[in-house]
């Protein structure tokens, strides 16, 4: 498993507040570390509103991440980018003990962003867009996919139903097979 992701609409204490219809939120991840391993990650704090979770128990909070260029095959959450460059991307590699050694093709973890309705009224929809980046080819013949889902609840662990709007919202690796790296 090479890539994985999840975005959610939940309402934790540090959720990103949407204060009016048509409000925009952007995140470029450039505030993440550009070098090092074992950096402290605190859900809803390192990046306000963002959380990292892993299997085997849904909702197990992660406490570390590393910076990388895609050259490592060690499973974990990463701040990907060129060495020493502050232009970052949040992602992960799904293998290894970090995620409880998931079987190939199984979900390894979640990257979740939380929003709350701070408008004082009803919000009847939302629009989502992002740019996916591939920082590593795991060498497998099949594409590795980040799946977009959303749910409503007071926290990640209280969401009982996740909606998957379809494959057009997912990101699949564009380079597959060949030599890993």
Residue map of PLM features:
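Residues that flank catalytic or metal-binding motifs in active/ligand-binding sites
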Residues: 25, 46-48, 109-111, 142-144
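Exoplasmic/lumenal beta-rich domain surfaces
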Residues: 77, 82-84, 90, 145-181
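Extended, low-complexity, turn-rich repeat/linker tracts enriched in Gly/Pro/Ser/Thr and Asp/Glu
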Residues: 103, 133-143
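Boundary/junction segments of secreted and surface-exposed precursor proteins
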Residues: 7-32
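Acidic glycine-/aspartate-rich tracts in secreted/extracellular proteins
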Residues: 31-37, 135, 152-156
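A short beta-strand element within beta-rich, extracytoplasmic domains
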Residues: 123-137
């Amino acid at each position: 498993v090479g890539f994985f992701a999840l975005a959610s609409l939940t309402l934790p204490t540090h959720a990103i507040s949407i204060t009016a219809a048509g409000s925009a939120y952007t995140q470029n991840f450039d505030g993440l570390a550009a070098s090092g391993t074992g950096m402290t990650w605190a859900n809803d704090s390192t990046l306000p509103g963002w959380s990292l979770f892993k299997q085997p128990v849904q909702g197990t909070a992660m406490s570390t991440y590393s910076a990388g260029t895609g050259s490592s095959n060690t499973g974990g959450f990463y701040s990907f980018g060129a060495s020493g460059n502050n232009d970052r991307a949040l992602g992960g590699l799904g293998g290894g003990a970090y995620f409880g050694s998931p079987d190939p093709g199984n979900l390894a973890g979640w990257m979740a962003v939380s929003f709350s309705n701070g408008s004082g009224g009803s919000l009847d929809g939302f629009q989502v867009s992002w740019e996916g980046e591939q920082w590593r080819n795991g060498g497998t013949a099949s594409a590795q996919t980040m799946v977009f889902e959303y749910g409503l609840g007071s926290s990640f662990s209280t969401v009982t139903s996740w909606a998957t709007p379809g494959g057009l919202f997912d990101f699949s690796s564009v380079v597959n097979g060949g030599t890993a790296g």
